[in-house]
Amino acid sequence: MKNSEDMVKRSVNRRSFLRNGVLAGGAAVAGAGLLSSGKTMLAQENDDARGSLDRGDVAILRFVAAAEIIESDLWQQYAELGGITSDSSTNPYQAAFQVLDSDGLQYITSNTNDEISHATFLNAYLESKGEEPVNLDEFRTLQGSQATGAQNIGRLTNLMHLTVDTSWYIRYRSTTNPDFGATYPQALTITNRTSIPITDADFDNQMHIQAIANTAAFHFGTVEQAGSSLYASLGQKVTHAEVLEITLGIGADEVAHFLEWWILPATPSPDRRSRITD
């Protein structure tokens, strides 16, 4: 995680709750019932915030720490090539993001730093409770981009052969609700596409590099909506008040990230902004 640290320096099922609770007599009544069963969501009143953690809470923290490390890995790849750089020059990939949003480069860098801080904090918290931190370094074996700006290091994630779930784009613009059985098609099909330039040759064609950035724009939303759902789900299963605070806090940050990205692929624009193939 050294490279990541350097960048910093720079169950209550929601669907069953809605179906059963709301239909049984309204959200207020169902909410009261939910709170009365408090142990799955809140710690006991006499729970010592400094005490040891329940095994289930440790498992949840280790799971989300692993997820944040993986998320940090993919965002770091985006930041190296498409985020804020130390010099004033802009490569064609960065320029393609600026076509979508003039602040796109800052968003990418900020999102990256946030994800790295999440992973760092979760591991530090685990250690403070006498638990083993999560380390995935042995799995950093994938080849990343060889374009100028990318670090020559092993990766956990491969952004050069992506299949992206784009159904969220329809879901979050729909008047229907998945909690009541609604399903959503793909907004468009993204299969085996790269979302980062693979070599400097990808910089040479404007339409081509714009298609790569457009693919990334959909991937950003896919990643962050998943993170938002993850913390909302797992937060309902913890028993320690302090762990609940952590899941709520980081989960809220994931929601904020999604709010940055959900609109990006919808930018009203010429055709070159909406293409994912060139």
Question: Where is each model-derived feature located?
Answer:
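Cell-wall glycan-active module
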Residues: 35
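Twin-arginine (Tat) signal peptide motif
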Residues: 10-15
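All-alpha RGS (Regulator of G-protein Signaling) helical domain and cognate RGS-like helical scaffolds
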Residues: 2-8, 19-26, 40-278
